């Protein structure tokens, strides 16, 4: 399945720096320092992208990371400011679980998950990170999880239902559990 290209110029994107890391390269004359950044961009309406930048100065690294994130945009299906279904994704040694939450719950997420889901416009979410909590891998695992989300219409058509029937079934199950 080919991913659709999203034009970043048509969106009002907001940048968030997740991590700034000073890295060094050992050369004959000593160490050469540079900066590595992880940047998340999103419009708060279902579009999000992640990028990494590396440069001798922090502002250049942030700019490069933001440009990479704008080239890497995806659309996230939202249902009432949360995700449509639970998803568990693994990236490297990091495993991320994202679950839909009731309105008013807020984003219950750690350092790497929060900026990605907030940039996407998700207001209510439950999440858990298993395994490695390296911020780069957590951000990439979260991004992978969001890219694997299917919309409510796709889920309903797969089950030969209407989206309304699917939502009614979900709310009925949630009220029975409470």
From Swiss-Prot:
Any one GO CC term of the record: cytosolic small ribosomal subunit
GO biological process: translation
PROSITE patterns linked: RIBOSOMAL_S5 (PS00585), S5_DSRBD (PS50881)
NAD as UniProt keyword: no
NCBIfam families listed in its UniProt record: rpsE_bact
Family, similarity comment: Belongs to the universal ribosomal protein uS5 family.
Gene it is expressed from: rpsE
Reported function: With S4 and S12 plays an important role in translational accuracy.
Domain S5 DRBM residue range list: 13-76
One term of GO molecular function: rRNA binding
Organism: Chloroflexus aurantiacus (strain ATCC 29366 / DSM 635 / J-10-fl)
SUPFAM superfamilies with a match to the protein in the record: dsRNA-binding domain-like, Ribosomal protein S5 domain 2-like
Domain of life: Bacteria
Domain notes: The N-terminal domain interacts with the head of the 30S subunit; the C-terminal domain interacts with the body and contacts protein S4. The interaction surface between S4 and S5 is involved in control of translational fidelity.
Protein's recorded name: Small ribosomal subunit protein uS5
Subunit comment: Part of the 30S ribosomal subunit. Contacts proteins S4 and S8.
Record key words, sorted: Ribonucleoprotein, Ribosomal protein, RNA-binding, rRNA-binding
